[in-house]
From Swiss-Prot:
Residues holding a nucleoside 3',5'-cyclic phosphate: 449-579
Protein name, UniProt field: Cyclic nucleotide-gated ion channel 18
Family to which the UniProt record says this protein belongs: Belongs to the cyclic nucleotide-gated cation channel (TC 1.A.1.5) family.
Protein localization: Cell membrane; Cytoplasmic vesicle membrane
Pfam families (alphabetical): cNMP_binding (PF00027), Ion_trans (PF00520)
Extracellular topological intervals: 75-86, 164-174, 239-345
IQ domain boundaries: 585-614
Key words of the record: Calmodulin-binding, cAMP, cAMP-binding, Cell membrane, cGMP, cGMP-binding, Cytoplasmic vesicle, Ion channel, Ion transport, Ligand-gated ion channel, Membrane, Nucleotide-binding, Transmembrane, Transmembrane helix, Transport
Tissue occurrence: Expressed in pollen grains. Not detected in leaves, roots or root hairs.
Job description of the protein: Cyclic nucleotide-gated ion channel required for directional pollen tube growth into the transmitting tract. Acts as a Ca(2+)-permeable divalent cation-selective channel inhibited by either lanthanum or gadolinium. Regulated by CPK32 to mediate Ca(2+) transport across the plasma membrane in response to Ca(2+) oscillation.
Region (Calmodulin-binding): 565-580
Protein source organism: Arabidopsis thaliana (Mouse-ear cress)
GO MF, one annotated term: calmodulin binding
Length: 706
C-alpha cells in the first residue's frame, strides 16, 4: 500500500487527506480517479471560491426560472383556459440544469474541509480533513436544506399533478403550483444568503468593481419585482377561473343547464356540447372583468383582463407583469385598488411591506457601492480645497500657487489617489521584492554602472527605489546644492545644465529622457572609502521640462549598495562610469576643446616661425612653457608636421599673432605681480578659472574588506 501523493501537483490549492491511502494503480487514469475520489478541498482555496461564485449565479438564475411556471396557464378562448406547452418545456429544461448544479454543490460540500471550532482561538484555525467527520457534520447541518432546494417539485406539479387532477384538466391555475414554488424559495434563500456571506468572508467582496456591486443589488430588486409580477398574473388567472366555477355551480344547482368542469378547458372547444353550453350560459356575461356591471369583484386583478395581458403573447405578457411588479414595489402598493377579497388584501399588504424593505436595502447597498467609486475623488477634492485655503492664508504669489496646483493635479493623474508606498509596505518582503523587481529592474539595468552588478545587488537597489513626481519647471537639483538622491527617469524630459561654478561664458546642457539618470555625484561620494557625512554638491542644475515620473534612490541606500559592490572590482565598471557620467563628459569635452585650441595656436605659431625663419616665434610670449609642452605631448604626441600660409594673408596673420602674444604676456605679468603681493584689483579678474577634473571613485578593495 502506497501513500497517495498530494494533489498540489495536479490541481492548485487543493488538499489531500493525510489519512487516505490506496493501492498502487497500473495506469495514470486510475490514479487520477482515485485522487478525485479521496480529494479534500480547502474551503478558502481558489477552486472552492470559484465554484461558490458559479453556484451563486446559478442559484439566482434558478430563482428567476421558477416564476416562469406561473405564465404557463393563459386564457385560450371564451370561458376556457389552456397551457403553454413550449414555455413549460423550456422552463423545465433549464430548471433541471439548475437542479444538477445543486446536486454538484451537495457533492462539493461532502468533499470540503471545515475549521474545527475548538481551534479558532488563534489564527485561522485547524482544518478537519477526515472525510467521515466532514460527512457527519454536513448531514447534521445543511444537508436537508440542500436536498429540499434540489428537489424538482415544480416539474412534478406541472407535468404530473395538474394533468392527473380529477374531473379533467381545467384547473391549470391550481394554487398548488404557486404554493410549491414559493415554499421551495425558502430553502433556496437559506442557501443563497449564507453563500453570499461566505464569499464575502473569503474574498472580501461579492463583486470586484463598484458598478458590478450596484448591478448585483439591482438584480435582486428586479428578482423581487419579477416574482410579484408573476404572482399577480397567476392570481388574476385564478380569480377568473374562480368566477367561471361559481357561475357553473349556480347553473348546476338550478339544474337549468349542465356545466361540466371540462368545459372550462380549451381542449373541449370543438365538442358540440361545449358549443351549445357556450351559446346559452351566462358565464361570459357574469365574469367579464372589462364590464362595470359585473357583480364579481376582480379588484386589483381586473387590470390583467382590461389590458388583455391574459390573452396576449408571452413576451408582451412578461414585460407588462415585470413593469407591474416594479411599479407597485417601488410605490409600496399605493396605486393598487383592492376589493374586500381576503387573498387580495393580504397580497397588497405583502407588497407594501416587502417594497419598503427591499427599496431601502436597494438604496443603501447601491449608495455604498457607488460611494466606494467616488471616495478617493472626494478625498482629493477636500485635500485640494484645504491646499487652496492654505495658499490664500499664507498669501503665496500667483505663479507659486499655480505650480502647486499643477503638482497636485499631476499627482492625482499619476496615482489616482492610491498610496503606493503604503500598499507595498503592507505586503510581505518577498512579494514586495518581486513587485519592485518587476517595476524597476529593466530601468535600473539601463544604467551602465548598475548593469555590471549581480542580481542580488540589483534586487537590493530595486527595493530601495521610491516613486518621485515633478511638474514642468521644477528644479530637482540646483548647481552647488547638496545632492541627496539619484533619479532614474520613467516618463518626461529633464534638462541638465552647468555653468562650471558660474564661469562667465561657459554653459553646458543636455536633455535626459526615459531611461537616463541624474545625480551621479552620489556615485563618486558613495564609492569613496573614507567619505564624510557631508553630501556632495551638485555640479549641474537639473530642471524638469515636462511632467516627470521617476524612481529615486536615496544617498544612504546608494552608500550601502556601493559599499557592498566594492568587493566586485572591475576596470570595465570604471570606464562605464566615466563614459556615461554627464559630469565626466562635460569635463572631457572641455579638455579636448582646450587641447585642440592650444594645438591650433601652436601650429599657427610654428608656421609663422618657419616662414619668417627669424624670430617671430617665442614660446614664452605665446604663454606656453615646457610643462604645457610635455602635457600636450603626453596626451596627443609630438608635432612633426609643418604648414604654409598664403602670401596674401601673411601680413595680417603676423600682426594678429603679435597682438595675441602681447595680450597674453601682459595678462601673465599682471597675474604674477598679483601673486607676489602687488595690489592690483584688476589682475584677479583677468585670470580665467579652470574646469576642474571630477573626482575619481575608488574601485579598489580595502584591506579591511579582504
Amino acid at each position: 500500500m502506497n501513500k497517495i501523493r498530494s494533489l498540489r501537483c495536479l490541481l492548485p490549492e487543493t488538499i489531500t487527506s493525510a489519512s487516505t491511502a490506496a493501492s498502487n494503480r497500473g495506469s495514470d487514469g486510475s490514479q487520477f480517479s482515485v485522487l478525485w475520489r479521496h480529494q479534500i478541498l480547502d474551503p478558502d482555496s481558489n477552486i472552492v471560491t470559484y465554484w461558490n461564485h458559479v453556484f451563486l449565479i446559478t442559484s439566482i438564475l434558478a430563482l428567476f426560472l421558477d416564476p416562469f411556471y406561473f405564465y404557463v396557464p393563459y386564457v385560450g378562448g371564451p370561458a376556457c383556459l389552456s397551457i403553454d406547452i413550449s414555455l413549460a418545456a423550456t422552463v423545465t429544461f433549464f430548471r433541471t440544469v439548475a437542479d444538477i448544479f445543486h446536486l454538484l454543490h451537495i457533492f462539493m460540500k461532502f468533499r470540503t474541509a471545515f475549521v474545527a471550532r475548538s481551534s479558532r482561538v488563534f489564527g485561522r484555525g485547524e482544518l478537519v480533513m477526515d472525510s467521515r467527520e466532514i460527512a457527519m457534520r454536513y448531514l447534521k447541518t445543511d444537508f436537508l436544506i440542500d436536498v429540499a432546494a434540489m428537489l424538482p417539485l415544480p416539474q412534478l406539479v406541472i407535468w404530473l399533478v395538474i394533468p392527473a387532477a380529477t374531473n379533467g384538466t381545467a384547473n391549470h391555475a391550481n394554487s398548488t403550483l404557486a404554493l410549491i414554488v414559493l415554499v421551495q424559495y425558502i430553502p433556496r434563500s437559506f442557501i443563497i444568503f449564507p453563500l453570499n456571506q461566505r464569499i464575502i468572508k473569503t474574498t472580501g467582496f461579492i463583486a470586484k468593481t463598484a458598478w458590478a456591486g450596484a448591478a448585483y443589488n439591482l438584480l435582486l430588486y428586479i428578482l423581487a419585482s419579477h416574482v410579484l409580477g408573476a404572482m399577480w398574473y397567476l392570481s388574476s388567472i385564478g380569480r377568473q377561473f374562480s368566477c367561471w366555477s361559481n357561475v357553473c355551480k349556480k347553473d348546476n344547482a338550478l339544474r337549468v343547464l349542465d356545466c361540466l368542469p371540462s368545459f372550462l378547458d380549451c381542449k373541449s372547444l370543438e365538442q358540440p356540447e361545449r358549443q351549445y353550453w357556450q351559446n346559452v350560459t351566462q358565464v361570459l356575461s357574469h365574469c367579464d372583468a372589462t364590464s362595470s356591471t359585473t357583480n364579481f369583484k376582480f379588484g386589483m386583478f381586473a387590470e390583467a383582463f382590461t389590458t388583455q395581458v391574459a390573452t396576449t403573447d408571452f413576451v408582451s405578457k412578461y414585460l407588462y407583469c415585470l413593469w407591474w411588479g416594479l411599479r407597485n414595489l417601488s410605490s409600496y402598493g399605493q396605486n393598487i385598488t383592492t376589493s374586500v377579497y381576503l387573498g387580495e388584501t393580504l397580497f397588497c399588504i405583502t407588497i407594501c411591506i416587502f417594497g419598503l424593505i427591499l427599496f431601502t436595502l436597494l438604496i443603501g447597498n447601491m449608495q455604498s457601492s457607488l460611494q466606494s467609486m467616488s471616495v478617493r475623488v472626494e478625498e482629493w477634492r477636500v485635500k485640494r480645497r484645504d491646499t487652496e485655503e492654505w495658499m490664500r492664508h499664507r498669501q503665496l504669489p500667483p505663479e507659486l500657487q499655480e505650480r502647486v496646483r499643477r503638482f497636485v493635479q499631476y499627482k492625482w493623474l499619476a496615482t489616482r489617489g492610491v498610496d503606493e508606498e503604503s500598499i507595498l509596505h503592507s505586503l510581505p518582503t518577498d512579494l514586495r521584492r518581486e513587485i519592485q523587481r518587476h517595476l524597476c529592474l529593466s530601468l535600473v539595468r539601463r544604467v551602465p554602472f548598475f548593469s555590471q552588478m549581480d542580481d542580488q545587488l540589483l534586487d537590493a537597489i530595486c527595493g530601495c527605489l521610491v516613486s518621485s513626481l515633478s511638474t514642468a519647471g521644477t528644479y530637482i537639483f540646483r548647481e552647488g546644492d547638496p545632492v541627496n538622491e539619484m533619479l532614474f527617469v520613467i516618463r518626461g524630459q529633464i534638462e541638465s545644465s552647468t555653468t562650471n561654478g558660474g564661469r562667465s561664458g561657459f554653459f553646458n546642457s543636455t536633455t535626459l529622457r526615459p531611461g537616463d539618470f541624474c545625480g551621479e555625484e552620489l556615485l563618486t561620494w558613495a564609492l569613496m572609502p573614507n567619505s564624510t557625512l557631508n553630501l556632495p554638491s551638485s555640479t549641474r542644475s537639473v530642471r524638469a521640462l515636462s511632467e516627470v515620473e521617476a524612481f529615486a534612490l536615496s544617498a544612504e541606500d546608494l552608500k550601502f549598495v556601493a559599499h557592498q559592490f566594492k568587493r566586485l572590482q572591475s576596470k570595465k565598471l570604471q570606464h562605464a562610469f566615466r563614459y556615461y557620467s554627464h559630469q565626466w563628459r562635460a569635463w572631457g569635452a572641455c579638455f579636448v576643446q582646450s587641447a585642440w585650441r592650444r594645438y591650433k595656436r601652436r601650429k599657427l605659431a610654428k608656421e609663422l616661425s618657419l616662414h619668417e625663419s627669424s624670430g617671430y616665434y617665442y614660446p614664452d610670449e605665446t604663454g606656453y612653457n615646457e610643462e604645457d609642452e610635455e602635457t600636450r605631448e603626453y596626451y596627443y604626441g609630438s608635432d612633426e608636421e609643418g604648414g604654409s600660409m598664403d602670401n596674401t594673408n601673411l601680413g595680417a596673420t603676423i600682426l594678429a599673432s603679435k597682438f595675441a602674444a602681447n595680450t597674453r604676456r601682459g595678462t601673465n605679468q599682471k597675474a604674477s605681480s598679483s601673486s607676489t603681493g602687488k595690489k592690483d584689483g584688476s589682475s584677479t579678474s583677468l585670470k580665467m578659472p579652470q574646469l576642474f577634473k571630477p573626482d575619481e571613485p575608488d574601485f579598489s578593495i580595502d584591506k579591511e574588506d579582504v
